[in-house]
C-alpha cells in the first residue's frame, strides 16, 4: 500500500494533493489561520494539535506581522 492510499484510508488527504499556501500583502485573519494550519499540517503531519502543543506566541507574532512565515 502506498503512503497516499494509507492517508486516504485513515481519513486525511496526502500532502501531494495539497495546494501551496502563501501569505501575501494585505492578508486577512483567515489568510493567517490558513497559513498556520498548513504549517502545522506540513511540519507535524497534523493540523489538529492539542492546545498545549500549539506555538501560541509564534502564532500571535505571525498574526500581528512581527515575524514572517519562514520565521514562524
Curated annotation (Swiss-Prot):
Transmembrane segments: none annotated. Residues 1-72 form the PBS-linker domain. Gene3D superfamilies: Phycobilisome linker domain. Disulfide bonds: none annotated. One of its GO terms (cellular component) is plasma membrane-derived thylakoid membrane. InterPro entries: PBS_linker_dom, PBS_linker_sf. It comes from the Bacteria. Its main location: membrane. The keyword Coiled coil does not apply. It is a peripheral membrane protein. Keywords: Antenna complex, Membrane, Photosynthesis, Phycobilisome, Thylakoid. It is found in: Cellular thylakoid membrane. One of its GO terms (biological process) is photosynthesis. The keyword Membrane applies. Rod linker protein, associated with phycocyanin. Linker polypeptides determine the state of aggregation and the location of the disk-shaped phycobiliprotein units within the phycobilisome and modulate their spectroscopic properties in order to mediate a directed and optimal energy transfer. Belongs to the phycobilisome linker protein family. This is Phycobilisome 37.5 kDa linker polypeptide, phycocyanin-associated, rod. It comes from Pseudanabaena tenuis (strain PCC 7409).
Amino acid at each position: 500500500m502506498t503512503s497516499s492510499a494509507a492517508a486516504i484510508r485513515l481519513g486525511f488527504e496526502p500532502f501531494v494533493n495539497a495546494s501551496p499556501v502563501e501569505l501575501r500583502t494585505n492578508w486577512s485573519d483567515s489568510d493567517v489561520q490558513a497559513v498556520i494550519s498548513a504549517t502545522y499540517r506540513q511540519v507535524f503531519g497534523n493540523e489538529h494539535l492539542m492546545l498545549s502543543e500549539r506555538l501560541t506566541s509564534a502564532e500571535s507574532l505571525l498574526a500581528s506581522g512581527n515575524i514572517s512565515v519562514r520565521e514562524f
